[in-house]
């Protein structure tokens, strides 16, 4: 994909509004709850046995 300069600026402006820490944590939590088999890839994270623990 080849973005124009204007499209690149729009994309950067949208991503600048996102709280990466919060969105990343929420996305990872949903991943581990909705697809519990993915927990095996994150064994170093500790207790992932329930949504509350995650």
UniProtKB/Swiss-Prot annotation:
It comes from Notamacropus eugenii (Tammar wallaby). Hemoglobin omega chain is an embryonic-type beta-type chain found in prenatal and neonatal marsupials. GO terms for biological process: hydrogen peroxide catabolic process. Transmembrane segments: none annotated. GO terms for molecular function: haptoglobin binding; heme binding; metal ion binding; organic acid binding; oxygen binding; oxygen carrier activity; peroxidase activity. This is Hemoglobin subunit omega. PROSITE patterns: GLOBIN. InterPro entries: Globin, Globin-like_sf, Globin/Proto, Hemoglobin_b, Hemoglobin_oxygen_transport. GO terms for cellular component: blood microparticle; haptoglobin-hemoglobin complex; hemoglobin complex. Keywords: Heme, Iron, Metal-binding, Oxygen transport, Transport. Belongs to the globin family. Signal peptide: none annotated. The keyword Ribosomal protein does not apply. Residues 2-54 form the Globin domain.
């Amino acid at each position: 994909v080849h973005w124009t300069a204007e499209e690149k600026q729009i994309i950067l402006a949208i991503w600048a509004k996102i709280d990466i820490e919060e969105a990343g944590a929420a996305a990872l939590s949903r991943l581990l709850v909705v697809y519990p088999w993915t927990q095996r890839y994150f064994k170093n994270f500790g207790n992932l046995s329930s949504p509350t623990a995650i």
